[in-house]
């Protein structure tokens, strides 16, 4: 960390210094998720998150530079889906830093909506290295691609089409991902964006009728058209690692510096930490940081358990980046003039300026809240609905009817139990509910169970009344998602308290967080 001078990086160099680039390559910072047999570190999601968070406490630009190769990109896609030849060719070079990767998904018109990618690859015959072969002619225009200006290998998402039927009867094969060296003829990189003044490399890439062999498709020709599944599976995991790590770093840094500042900075003859207005903001910073760390640990643990928690990672991405923004706002309010004057000793300015980047990327927060959290969770997390849909789609009608009837009866019983449980818990104030622990946090478990029953009941009612229109009722979906999110964040907080041995010093933060979570859930 002592090698990192964020003011010099952002204001003077507009880039990481060469010695820092070399250090990151040499020490394997770009190979955190690459398997050991290819020279990588094979670190867990928790370790990956911890490293990114530590770097971000010093420099957002340095953290993003390390974070991107270890998130969605060539390294992860090759590890999960690459052929043995592709893995042998690329992973050792990526692990050593000889190759710098980027992944191009976002475009000028479609944004990061993978389903609306306009970039296209047409199956055709052409010459490559003096030999005629079957391949793809790619045309693309991408923007906002981190590391694109310096990348040596480009991961590209595009729509694959076979109008002449060279591969079979199917004309539109769907979203496909390919790996292309950036020195390949026709590939254009180098132009830089300026993401709120931060110094990490971010820019555009284009290509027009660039011919590549079919073997350059990640996973080989048999993975043609399977890019959607690849992107969804990898994005759902990565969304819960990198950006939540940046948000948690903001919390830790703000807590450490602002608590100290509030007691050394004097105003009107007394430390500003003695003013109740400042104490109120400090309480929010400390409690929100506790919440951030709790959610970071639980989310990355789920990813390490191979649960692929797409709903949970959407919750983490949205709420943790929003909490990070809240923490930085409070820290800036307390440190005031010190925070707004940029210079080598200003540790708040750059994290504060970069907040909108975390809010925007990997699914803009406003859409994550209104479309993704409950929109995905209503079906994925329901104990009966997904199974009922699968039963209805079965080809054997007799078997389908028997299966559906059994599920429907179970569903009705489930809804009835939730209705009575929610009503009884509400009337009794959750006093007669059960809890897995005793002591100071016992009531929080009971209250969470009451809200969980109420959410389950409201989910069933919403799905019954609105059916398929529920996803389009974004404001309702957002509020239902808020309840689900508060339950998850509250669970993470209680788990961290238990994991840390029920430390009494943590109890004020736990009480603050849980009171806030329960209030927000009730409000939603």
Where are each of the predicted segments found?
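Flexible, small-/acidic-enriched active-site or ligand-binding loops
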Residues: 185-211
């Amino acid at each position: 960390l002592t090698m990192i001078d964020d003011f010099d990086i952002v204001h003077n160099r507009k880039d990481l210094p060469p010695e820092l680039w070399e250090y990151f390559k040499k020490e394997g910072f770009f190979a955190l998720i690459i398997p050991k047999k290819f020279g990588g570190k094979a670190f867990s999601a928790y370790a990956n998150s911890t490293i990114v968070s530590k770097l971000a406490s010093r420099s957002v630009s340095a953290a993003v530079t390390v974070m991107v190769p270890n998130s969605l990109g060539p390294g992860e896609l090759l590890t999960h889906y690459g052929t043995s030849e592709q893995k042998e060719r690329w992973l050792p070079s990526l692990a050593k830093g000889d190759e710098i990767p980027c992944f191009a998904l976002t475009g000028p018109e479609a944004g990061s909506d993978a389903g609306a990618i306009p970039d296209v690859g047409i199956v055709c015959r052409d010459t490559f290295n003096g030999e005629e072969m079957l391949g793809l002619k790619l045309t693309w225009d991408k923007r906002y691609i981190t590391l694109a200006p310096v990348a040596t290998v480009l991961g590209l998402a595009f729509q694959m089409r076979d109008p002449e039927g060279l591969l079979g009867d199917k004309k539109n094969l769907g979203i496909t991902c390919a790996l292309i060296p950036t020195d390949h003829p026709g590939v254009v990189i180098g132009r830089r964006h300026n993401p709120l003044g931060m110094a990490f490399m971010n820019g555009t890439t284009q290509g027009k009728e660039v011919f590549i062999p079919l073997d350059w498709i990640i996973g080989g020709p048999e993975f043609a058209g399977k890019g959607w599944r690849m992107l969804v599976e990898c994005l759902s995991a990565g969304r819960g690692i990198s950006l939540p790590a940046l948000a948690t770093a903001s919390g830790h840094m703000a807590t450490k510096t602002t608590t100290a500042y509030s007691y050394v900075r004097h105003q009107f003859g007394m430390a500003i930490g003695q003013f109740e207005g400042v104490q109120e903001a400090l309480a929010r910073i400390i409690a929100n940081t506790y919440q951030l760390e709790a959610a970071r640990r639980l989310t990355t643990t789920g990813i390490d358990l191979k649960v692929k928690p797409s709903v949970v990672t959407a919750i983490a991405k949205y709420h943790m980046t929003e909490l990070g923004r809240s923490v930085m706002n409070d820290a800036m309010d307390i440190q005031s003039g010190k925070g707004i004057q940029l210079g080598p000793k200003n540790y708040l300015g750059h994290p504060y300026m970069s907040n909108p980047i975390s809010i925007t990327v990997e699914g803009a927060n406003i859409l994550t809240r209104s479309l993704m959290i409950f929109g995905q969770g209503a079906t994925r997390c329901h104990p009966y609905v997904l199974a009922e849909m699968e039963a209805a789609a079965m080809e054997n009608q007799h078997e389908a009817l028997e299966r559906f009837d059994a599920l429907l009866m179970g569903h009705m019983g489930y809804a009835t139990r939730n209705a009575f449980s929610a009503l009884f818990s509400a009337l009794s104030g959750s006093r007669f509910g059960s809890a897995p622990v005793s002591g100071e946090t016992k009531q929080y478990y009971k209250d969470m169970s009451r809200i969980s029953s109420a959410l389950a009941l409201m989910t069933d009612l919403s799905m019954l009344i609105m059916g398929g229109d529920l996803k389009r009722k974004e404001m309702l979906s957002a509020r239902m998602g808020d309840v689900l999110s508060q339950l998850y964040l509250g669970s993470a907080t209680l788990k961290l308290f238990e994991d840390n041995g029920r430390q009494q010093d943590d109890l004020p933060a736990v009480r603050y967080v849980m009171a806030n979570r329960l209030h927000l859930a009730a409000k939603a």
